[in-house]
A protein has these predicted regions:
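Helix-loop-helix hairpin linking two adjacent transmembrane segments in secondary transporters
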Residues: 81-82, 90-136
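Cytoplasmic helix-loop-helix junction between adjacent transmembrane helices
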Residues: 50, 56-97
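Structural signature of the two symmetry-related core transmembrane helices
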Residues: 28-42, 236-251
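Symmetry-related core transmembrane helices of the 12-TM Major Facilitator Superfamily/SLC fold
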Residues: 117-133, 329-347
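Conserved MFS/SLC helix-loop-helix module at the cytosolic interface between two early adjacent transmembrane helices
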Residues: 11-50
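A late C-terminal transmembrane helix in Major Facilitator Superfamily
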Residues: 284-323
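Extracytoplasmic gate region of multi-pass secondary transporters
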Residues: 172-213, 219
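Helix-to-loop junctions at the C-terminal end of transmembrane segments
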Residues: 12-25, 221-234, 318
Length: 361
């Protein structure tokens, strides 16, 4: 409950922050989220019982939910074209490397006192001070207006039909949400099931933490070169990374050696590391300048939905195939799912969801 409740609260508040960003001051929403984040971290240091700790972590989930879409949405407000794509890639990379560093730091702090890991939650205080400078800069709305609000297409009728999402190409955004949800779900088997696999095959249990860290470091790398990757792969920018994820999961499933498992984690991470910033960039392009943060919020919410549902989906599917309790079956199952996604991605590689973004926009 202590770990799942914040994630559960993040989803509705990501969506709420996205909706509020359309008509409210984005910086005020960001400041509020960062302040709640810091306050919850501060009071966690003094929590004496589990009930109070759960309540404080719920506040943390609310604050995180408000910060997540705004931190990326402000990039879309201030940059355009290929430079925006590059900045979104860097943002994705920073998120993943921070996750690795924060996990390592909290593990060390926990050896001193169980309260000390909550010190990490005070870091948004630094971000809060830095974001105060954003009040001095306003995005060039004239430049932003050069981005097509919603490309003229047969989906315009669908856009008009969804009254609560004006200014967003809903069919394209839904396609991106589905792609992101499935891609996130299939790779989460690494973080959720790898420790059980290594324990089952009497491999070093301590090495599983290293493998998972390697996985997140691999996710970080493509974001640093995302525009170069898109230009090189062109319309293969989605289905080739999906094939990499499939190859990584199969390496983990087929070869039970620590070095092959590590390689599998790295390969799968590289594949997902291309898809994540690419989906963010395409999501921005489905909306006009007023609704970019809302579009990002909708897409980002499915990431946390996948995190919440992954264990239940894995249990359901392994049960249907009569493999309940299997340590390695989830890897081959998800490899099959992502292979099917890659086939679809190749078939529709010229489409908006599976194709490469146009940097001329």
């Amino acid at each position: 409950m202590l770990t799942s409740l914040p994630s559960l609260l993040i989803i509705p508040f990501v969506l709420l922050a996205g909706k509020l960003s359309v008509s409210r001051n984005k910086l005020l929403i960001l400041y509020t989220g960062l302040a709640l984040f810091c306050i919850s971290g501060f009071f966690s240091l003094f929590a004496k019982n589990i009930v109070l700790l759960i309540f404080i972590n719920c506040v943390l989930g609310v604050g995180a939910g408000m910060v997540i879409p705004l931190s990326t949405g402000l990039i879309a407000d201030h940059f355009t074209g290929a430079y925006r794509t590059r900045q979104l890639g860097i943002s994705s990379s920073i998120s993943n490397v921070t996750l690795v560093l924060a996990t390592s730091l909290t593990g060390w702090l926990a050896t001193v006192d169980w309260h000390y890991p909550f010190l990490v939650y005070l870091l948004p205080g630094v971000a809060l001070l830095m974001t105060l400078s954003l009040r001095k800069y306003k995005p060039d709305r004239g430049e932003a207006a050069t981005i097509p609000a919603v490309p003229a297409s047969p989906t315009d009728a669908a856009i008009g039909a969804v009254k609560w999402l004006p200014g967003i190409d809903v069919p394209r955004l839904v396609g991106l949400m589905l792609l992101y949800f499935l891609a996130t779900y299939v790779v989460l088997v690494v973080t959720f099931n790898l420790p059980f696999l290594m324990q089952h095959y009497t491999l070093s249990s301590s090495a599983s933490g290293v493998m998972i860290s390697l996985f997140f470091l691999a996710i970080m790398l493509p974001g640093l070169f995302i525009t170069w990757i898109i230009r090189k792969l062109k319309n293969a920018t989605v289905f080739l990374p999906l094939l990499l994820i499939c190859a990584g999961l199969l390496l983990i499933y087929l070869f039970k050696y620590e070095w092959t498992i590590g390689l599998g984690c790295f390969v799968a991470g590289i594949g997902y590391g291309v898809i994540q910033p690419l989906v963010y960039d395409k999501s921005v392009r489905t909306a006009d300048s007023k609704n970019t943060t809302l579009a990002l919020a909708l897409v980002m919410s499915v990431n946390y939905l996948a995190i919440l549902l992954c264990p239940f989906i894995v249990d359901l599917l392994t049960g249907l195939f009569g493999k309940s309790g299997s340590a390695d079956f989830p890897f081959v199952l998800n490899a099959a799912i992502v292979l099917l996604m890659a086939v679809v991605g190749y078939r529709y590689r010229e489409s908006y969801v599976f194709g490469a973004p146009d940097f001329s926009e």
